[in-house]
A protein has these predicted regions:
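Glycan-binding loop/region signatures in secreted carbohydrate-active enzymes
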Residues: 130-194
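Long, low-complexity, intrinsically disordered polar/charged segments
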Residues: 5-32, 120-125, 144, 148-149, ...
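Short amphipathic alpha-helical segments and helix-helix/interface helices
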Residues: 39, 43, 75-76, 112-116, ...
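Active-site region of glycoside hydrolase catalytic domains
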Residues: 44, 48, 84-87, 93, ...
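Surface-exposed substrate-engagement region within the catalytic domains
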Residues: 73-79, 88, 118, 149-164
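Gly/Pro-rich active-site loop or hairpin
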Residues: 94-115, 172, 177-192
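Chitinase-like catalytic core of GlcNAc-active glycosidases
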Residues: 1-104
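Active-site glycine- and acidic-residue-rich loops that bind
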Residues: 61-69, 105-108, 134-136, 146-149
Length: 194
């Protein structure tokens, strides 16, 4: 830890950064307290030099949420240890998962509803997706892989294939289907200004 802290401080000063956002993922639950203690130590050191410390948190919906992505992030402890948190409210639709919105609004709201019970609201910021995925169909779990695409590329694909962009009112996300030159049907979810 000491070497990491020293290197972080040197990098912040050398590059002229204002602070640091720590994004440690897949921490086992038994390390949750140690992780929060590390963040508290790092914050004290960084704040004393005029830097801020933030931490990115997996999108939890309860304190006891199971899973390696969630168990190492104690929202209350991390929220107390840092200057601010960035909730990773994206990746419900992802490369290896079934076609769906990257950041469905009901999921984002559920995470935020829980977060404000554990972390002061003024410390909470939402991570927003600015990309999409292009799934070849049919989706087969463990086999299908959807490449990520920019929102602009998604719009270009819809134009190239002369298909209408639809809008899922529940997820609050645009999507469309198109048929590739090889006959494969694709489903694309992305984000736009709506």
């Amino acid at each position: 830890q000491d070497r990491l802290v020293d290197q972080v401080q040197q990098t912040l000063r050398r590059r002229g950064y204002a602070g640091l956002d720590v994004d440690f993922e897949f921490l086992p639950g038994q390390l949750a307290a140690a992780y929060a203690a590390f963040l508290a130590r790092l914050r004290r050191l960084l704040n004393s030099q005029g830097f801020f410390l933030w931490a990115a948190l997996a999108p939890k919906t309860s304190a006891r949420q199971a899973g390696l992505l969630y168990e190492g992030h104690d929202y209350a402890a991390v929220g107390a240890a840092v200057d601010g948190v960035l909730l990773m409210t994206y990746e419900w639709g992802y490369t290896a998962g079934p076609p769906m919105a990257v950041s469905p609004l009901p999921n984002v709201r559920t995470v935020l509803d829980y977060a404000v019970t554990e972390i002061p609201p003024e410390k909470i910021f939402l991570g927003l997706s600015n990309y999409g995925y292009d799934w070849p169909l049919p989706f087969v779990q463990g086999v299908t892989r959807a490449p990520s695409i920019s929102n602009q590329r998604a719009i270009e694909l819809a134009i190239e294939h002369d298909v209408a962009i639809q809008y899922d009112e529940t997820a609050q996300a645009p999507f469309f289907h198109y048929t590739a030159a090889d006959g494969t049907i694709h489903e694309v979810w992305f984000e736009d200004a709506r």
